[in-house]
């Protein structure tokens, strides 16, 4: 007789283990920011925490090799993104380049490993952090540009150096390549939408937090037609619930240090809920997390929250419209009997990239 399958662990035990791991990851993610903040005394370097998340996701989704390339590319791209955001045309062109890169990575199944690169660079293009005692953004300040590149490199390289050792015994899912019939529409959709939005936001100075709209588009658009509508609805619901939390924080908390600590707590909860089947729970927790981390004042927390709610709704509408067009085109191809086109030698080379 075959041995009986082991009974699943109780839910509280699973959540406790996830919470413990999430706490460790979040606490480690703060270390680069603390070190750089002690050196520079500039709040802008707390973006190292975001860079840490970028490197951590790249390690999980693509392996140490892909993560290393991702961190180096992000560090080099950071000053370019900040300078490019000085004019709408240059900023939109650089965003188009990043989206084309992400679309190409989807052919190899590596788009999830590199997704945060254009998302974080959207912030650098549209709304880079303040620098200096005057709290101004000088996109041509060489010191500022250099330190932001260092910030993204230091924050991103830490998980690349630390976590592969602990993850070596885990069976991580292999990247899933996509045929050109799926990766090409995906590339076109994200490039057209994000490029157009970037130009619009840079041309309209009132849209200081328009990077939320770009991140909404990039997160919601899927390769193929799997789960787009469901994920869009859950993201909107979760973000609106997170907005309620942000509104309460604005009324009760006026210290940026306290807000940062609150952001860490929500970050732990968000990581714990990340692998939950209920995506809206994760979105409700990650919304106040990111807003608390990226706002430079308690007033801006409220403004960021309000604009994010608008951006999510607009982005969701754009994504659903674009998805309807691409899904319809895909079904039309299938009805005509056209088979997917796939670059087999390139896809077979995926392991060499990881």
Roles of regions detected by a PLM:
Residues 33-50, 80-97, 148-154, 205-213, ...:
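Structural signature of hydrophobic alpha-helical transmembrane segments
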Residues 176, 333-354:
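Short, highly charged, low-complexity non-transmembrane loops/tails of multi-pass membrane proteins
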Residues 1-75, 323:
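N-terminal signal-anchor module of multipass membrane proteins
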Residues 81-180:
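Membrane-interface helix-loop-helix junctions at boundaries between adjacent transmembrane segments
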Residues 176-200:
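Membrane-water interface at loop-to-transmembrane-helix junctions
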Residues 137-158, 300-322:
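Structural signal for the N-terminal portions of transmembrane helices
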Residues 58-70, 88, 103-117, 225-234, ...:
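Membrane-helix interface "capping/anchor" motifs
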Residues 193-253:
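Transmembrane helical segments that form the transport core of multi-pass membrane transport proteins
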């Amino acid at each position: 007789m075959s041995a009986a399958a082991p009974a699943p662990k109780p839910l509280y035990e699973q959540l406790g283990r996830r919470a413990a791991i999430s706490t460790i990851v979040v606490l480690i993610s703060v270390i680069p920011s603390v070190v750089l903040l002690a050196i520079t005394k500039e709040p802008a370097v707390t973006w190292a925490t975001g860079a840490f998340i970028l490197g951590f996701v790249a390690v999980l989704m693509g392996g140490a090799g892909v993560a290393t390339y991702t961190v180096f590319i992000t560090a080099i791209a950071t000053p370019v993104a900040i300078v490019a955001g000085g004019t709408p045309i240059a900023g939109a062109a650089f965003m188009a380049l990043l989206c084309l890169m992400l679309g190409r990575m989807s052919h190899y199944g590596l788009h999830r490993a590199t997704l945060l690169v254009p998302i974080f660079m959207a912030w650098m293009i549209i709304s880079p952090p303040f620098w200096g005692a005057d709290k101004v953004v000088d996109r041509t300040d060489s010191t500022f540009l250099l330190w932001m590149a260092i910030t993204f490199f230091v924050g991103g390289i830490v998980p690349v150096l630390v976590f592969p050792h602990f993850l070596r015994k885990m069976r991580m899912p292999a990247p899933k390549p996509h045929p050109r019939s799926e990766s090409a529409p995906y590339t076109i959709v994200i490039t057209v939408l994000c490029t157009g939005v970037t130009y619009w936001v840079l041309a309209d100075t009132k849209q200081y937090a328009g990077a939320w709209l770009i991140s909404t588009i990039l997160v919601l658009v899927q390769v193929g037609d799997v789960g787009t509508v469901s994920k869009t609805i859950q993201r909107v619901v979760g973000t609106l619930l997170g907005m309620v939390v942000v509104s309460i924080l604005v009324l009760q908390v006026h210290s940026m240090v306290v807000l940062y600590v609150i952001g860490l707590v929500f970050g732990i909860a968000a990581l714990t809920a990340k692998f939950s089947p209920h995506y809206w729970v994760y979105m409700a927790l990650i919304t106040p997390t990111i807003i608390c981390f990226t706002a430079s004042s308690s007033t801006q927390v409220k403004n960021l929250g309000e604009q994010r709610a608008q951006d999510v709704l607009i982005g969701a509408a754009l994504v659903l419209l674009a998805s309807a067009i691409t899904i319809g085109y895909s079904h039309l191809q299938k009805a005509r009997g056209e088979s997917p086109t796939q670059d087999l030698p390139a896809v077979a080379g995926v392991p060499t990239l990881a």
